[in-house]
Swiss-Prot record:
One of the record's GO cellular component terms: cytosol
Subunit structure: Homodimer.
Organism of this sequence: Halorhodospira halophila (strain DSM 244 / SL1) (Ectothiorhodospira halophila (strain DSM 244 / SL1))
This protein's domain notes: Consists of three domains: the N-terminal catalytic domain, the editing domain and the C-terminal anticodon-binding domain.
Keywords carried by this UniProt record: Aminoacyl-tRNA synthetase, ATP-binding, Cytoplasm, Ligase, Nucleotide-binding, Protein biosynthesis
Gene3D superfamilies according to UniProt: Anticodon-binding domain, Bira Bifunctional Protein, Domain 2, YbaK/aminoacyl-tRNA synthetase-associated domain
Reaction catalysis annotation: tRNA(Pro) + L-proline + ATP = L-prolyl-tRNA(Pro) + AMP + diphosphate
Record-given protein name: Proline--tRNA ligase
Enzyme class: ligase
Underlying gene: proS
GO biological process, one term: prolyl-tRNA aminoacylation
NCBIfam families the UniProt entry points to: PRK09194.1, proS_fam_II
Entry EC number(s): 6.1.1.15
Amino acid sequence: MRVTRFPLSTTRETPADAEIVSHQLMLRAGMIRRLSSGLYTWLPLGLRVLQKVERIVREEMNRAGALEVLMPAVQPAELWQESGRWEKYGPELLRIRDRHDREGCFGPTHEEVITDLFRREIRSYRQLPVNYYQIQTKFRDEIRPRFGVMRAREFLMKDAYSFHLDDDDLRAEYQRMHEAYCRIFQRTGLAFRPVEADTGAIGGSVSHEFMVLADSGEDAIAVCEASGYAANVELAPAVAPTEPRPAPQAERAEVATPGQRTIAEVAAYLGLPEARNLKTLLVEGADGGLVALLLRGDHELNELKAEKHPAVKAPLTFAEAERVERQLGCPFGSLGPVGLTGVTLIADHAAAHLADFACGANREGYHLTGVNWGRDLPEPETADLREVTAGDPSPDGEGTLTLRRGIEVGHIFQLGTTYSEAMGASVLDEQGQERTVTMGCYGIGVSRVVAAAIEQNHDDRGICWPAPIAPFQVALVAIKAEDPAVAEAAEALYADLTASGIDVLYDDRDARPGVKFADMELIGIPHRVVVSPRAIQEGSVEYKGRQDADPTHVPRAEIVTWLKNRLT
């Protein structure tokens, strides 16, 4: 492809509204252009990358035995009402009405549609298992679209759905999909980790996220390098202390702490480490009362864990200060469990292991020190309520945890019968009896993979594409193209490279060398070959890898073979 026929829409300035590197570089490289909030047009350069990711996904899904279909983007409300998700899904579901006043929605996902297709088409256990997939545009009405295509309202997704007679067969297919996903992300050239994850709004019992590792990642993941354990911090269990709780050494005392509001302030004022301070968080209870969640001062509440506790109202709702002061007669900033009546107390395992700790005294400007369980207040109900921290024991008992940042690009679920029961998806088994099928679903954010690849692979000059998904394999640059000898040599090399099946972008513009080099580095083509008057005299060309420090001179007669060896 010639640049004169493939206009580059590169810019030198970083757009002011682009917050993360991938958004900045996709705009600067001319890969995408914003149409409206969360809506983007993919330009030819960006589309080439998107299509390469899509091709890898399609090849591996086909290899794993999945069958490609294409379902409508607009879905009737009746299916969502039948599954029970019409009201549950929330405002991210863009609801519409047609001219006949029929309700529908733009699909953010397709569990209902595929389950409806299955119950119409598949009748016998002999037709199982079956796994359908599609690569299609989705729409989720994000309240604050940001980060370019990383969190857009419209995006390209591969979603697959499998149907099985029993859970054993589902688990086998789930493992096949897990392996297929690993091959997909290996082929894209990305560093990634599969991690245990929460099932969220999709539902089901077991799920894994596939995380591209990047410092800018929105998600925190807990990893044990010794054992290979990995989980989203939302799900990672915090191991309870195993050693005996220390015996009390101090007497309880009430201490004035004027103006000290935060854990850090109180700890510094009292001369105690934050780990020996107890924080009390009041939330709405499932029975309409209040629940006090008690954590060590240096630990953070894991809201997902708290929300799953049967005593806690879902979704998790923190108590309003007005209600606390009215019902308990004490200010928000001085709460503590001692003498707190009419409130259910639930302590994190680590908090229940404290001795001689400090906590709020339930009156303004005062805290208690030397507090001990069993002496100053009853032994609490305990639960895992906190987020894991670096250095915690790994839940699998091998080694310790480190925390990494990741970008979710894939998510797979064992759905079970969540949708098939609600929608009556069944088959006749070997005995001729109706049997509800069990399901799995498997998603990849295809457009999100592109942004994640940039977040992981860039420098101060631009994108450094992994070779399998680069828009072009080789950039051919002619220096002093107005020189007939240079033009002739560059044209001949372009023809040779193209004939050899190499995907090449030939910069035949009448532009300064610095402009050409800067553009090729910005758009991230992995290999650059330069034809210049000096190189012609030497019978060579100049080669430079995108991340090489210095160029290499390669004989002209050998460059095609030399490149092909590096591309395989």
